[in-house]
């Protein structure tokens, strides 16, 4: 398991200044070496742009107040640090100082007696030194142990330093450059092994539970030195064992006390609620309701596509059902037929169009019948508005009438026309069905021409020519039966 470090967050001047101050105190602590004439100062500190890599190898202990883990640490970045100091260039002066350091304080007089007394040879000769450390490559396995009561402990299991680049003002002098390279590598190895863990341990003591009250008082005194912080009550004074944990009852009392001194606040969040985010107050629901609003807007075409939505819902329900189903039972579904009304409407429209076509007139004329025969004749009449007939249906031919024709001649011609051979089989069947339908309709309507036609009567579509024949006159009425427009045959 590994994790990434947000390296950009540490590229701040405040952190760089704090780290430089911490390193200055660390480098100048203890007795200064005789080769140095002044303290070491950090001129420039850069963390670079490449973060280190941490890999978790083992988590031994993980609780609310303690942690123990083993990590693998690797770094090969572009961090750099520039140091400035002054070194002693007189070797006799360095020898004399090192000779005196071999004797203890009570033997100082003996050291002054045995050292050589050089007059001008032991004078101080200072040379400024600028030292830059870059191209640092580290790799090690570290153990981190943290406790609220004891602080942070860091241990390197091996030497973390693999390589480092040292550049100084003595690079042209090869012996001095090699000496500085070896000396700095040795010092940095000791720095990671001994000095760095002790610095981190002392620094972590300021932020643990034991020293939290002192740190809080120092912080208040730094921000407000004029205030008297001796009478201030802290969380450490209320509950020394667990200063950062407050019971719900105590928090409710603090909330009531805090709200009693707040006036003219409309729905504002009480300051005491920040101590425990798990508590539910009257303002909790005011913050929760806006979070339940649906912020995802759907397009109109997605909502209108009912079939696609139902298909998506069906797939989702099927996945949930089969995921939670322990047996092989099939899901029970309610079947909803879509588009049945539309299909029925289309069927009705088709039937109406067929009936409308049957009512269309293929030829113009009136129908005469002598009452004794089922054969009918046609006379010329005015045109009637009609829809264009389909080419699939045959067009019936009307019988040509002459003024000197009698009814018998018309009937005879009609009989011959009736027995005329028709080649298409479909035409014969269609004409036969139309004649059967005509016979059924001719059984009813008997038209009296002495009376005006009734509204809606089929005779209003025709201008009938009446043949005056004494043989077919029955009490002044002609036995005429008129068929509706679709059956003018």
Swiss-Prot record:
GO CC annotations on file: ERMES complex
Residue intervals of the SMP-LTD domain: 1-205
Protein's membrane topology: Multi-pass membrane protein
Cited InterPro entries: Mdm34 (IPR027536), SMP_LBD (IPR031468)
UniProt keyword list: Lipid transport, Lipid-binding, Membrane, Mitochondrion, Mitochondrion outer membrane, Transmembrane, Transmembrane beta strand, Transport
Top-level taxonomic group: Eukaryota
Record localization: Mitochondrion outer membrane
Entry similarity comment: Belongs to the MDM34 family.
Function recorded in the entry: Component of the ERMES/MDM complex, which serves as a molecular tether to connect the endoplasmic reticulum (ER) and mitochondria. Components of this complex are involved in the control of mitochondrial shape and protein biogenesis, and function in nonvesicular lipid trafficking between the ER and mitochondria. MDM34 is required for the interaction of the ER-resident membrane protein MMM1 and the outer mitochondrial membrane-resident beta-barrel protein MDM10.
Assembly: Component of the ER-mitochondria encounter structure (ERMES) or MDM complex, composed of MMM1, MDM10, MDM12 and MDM34.
Domain remark text: Lacks alpha-helical transmembrane segments, suggesting that it resides in the membrane via beta-sheet conformations similar to those predicted for other outer membrane proteins and porin.
Name of the protein in its database record: Mitochondrial distribution and morphology protein 34
Organism: Komagataella phaffii (strain GS115 / ATCC 20864) (Yeast)
């Amino acid at each position: 398991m590994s994790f990434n470090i947000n390296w950009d967050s540490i590229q701040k001047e405040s952190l760089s200044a704090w780290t430089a101050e911490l390193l200055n105190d660390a480098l100048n602590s203890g007795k200064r070496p005789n080769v140095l004439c002044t303290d070491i100062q950090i001129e420039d500190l850069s963390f670079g742009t490449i973060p280190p890599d941490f890999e978790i190898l083992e988590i031994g202990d993980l609780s609310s107040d303690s942690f123990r883990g083993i990590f693998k640490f690797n770094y090969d970045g572009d961090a750099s640090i520039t140091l400035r100091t002054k070194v002693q260039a007189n070797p006799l002066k360095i020898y004399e100082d090192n000779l005196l350091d071999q004797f203890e304080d009570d033997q100082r007089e003996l050291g002054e007696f045995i050292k050589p007394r050089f007059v001008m040879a032991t004078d101080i000769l200072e040379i400024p030194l600028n030292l830059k450390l870059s191209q640092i490559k580290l790799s090690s396995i570290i153990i981190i142990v943290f406790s609220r009561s004891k602080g942070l402990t860091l241990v390197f299991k091996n030497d973390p330093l693999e390589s480092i680049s040292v550049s100084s003002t003595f690079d042209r002098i090869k012996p001095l450059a090699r000496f500085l390279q070896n000396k700095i590598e040795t010092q940095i190895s000791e720095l990671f092994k001994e000095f760095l863990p002790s610095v981190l341990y002392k620094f972590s003591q300021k932020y643990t539970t034991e020293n939290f009250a002192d740190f809080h008082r120092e912080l208040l005194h730094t921000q407000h030195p004029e205030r008297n912080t001796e009478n201030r009550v802290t969380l450490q004074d209320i509950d020394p064992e667990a200063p950062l944990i407050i019971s719900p009852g105590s928090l409710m009392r603090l909330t009531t006390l805090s709200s009693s001194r707040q006036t003219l606040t409309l729905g504002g969040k009480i300051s005491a609620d920040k101590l425990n985010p798990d508590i539910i107050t009257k303002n909790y629901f005011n913050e929760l309701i806006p979070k339940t609003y649906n912020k995802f807007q759907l397009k109109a075409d997605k909502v209108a596509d009912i079939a696609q939505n139902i298909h998506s819902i069906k797939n989702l329900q099927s996945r949930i059902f089969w995921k939670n189903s322990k047996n092989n039972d099939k899901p029970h579904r309610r079947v909803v037929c879509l588009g049945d009304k539309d299909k029925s409407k289309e069927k009705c429209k088709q039937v109406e169009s067929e009936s409308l076509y049957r009512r269309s007139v293929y030829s113009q004329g009136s129908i005469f019948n002598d009452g004794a025969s089922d054969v009918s004749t046609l006379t010329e009449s005015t045109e009637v508005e009609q829809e264009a007939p389909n080419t699939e249906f045959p067009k019936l031919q009307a019988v040509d009438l002459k003024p000197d024709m009698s009814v018998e001649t018309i009937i005879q011609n009609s009989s011959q026309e009736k027995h005329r051979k028709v080649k298409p089989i479909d035409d014969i069947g269609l004409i036969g069905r139309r004649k059967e339908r005509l016979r059924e309709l001719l059984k009813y309507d008997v038209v009296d021409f002495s009376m005006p036609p009734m509204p809606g009567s089929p005779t209003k579509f025709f201008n009938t020519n009446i043949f005056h024949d004494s043989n077919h006159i029955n009490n002044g009425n002609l036995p005429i039966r008129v068929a509706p427009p679709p059956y003018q045959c």
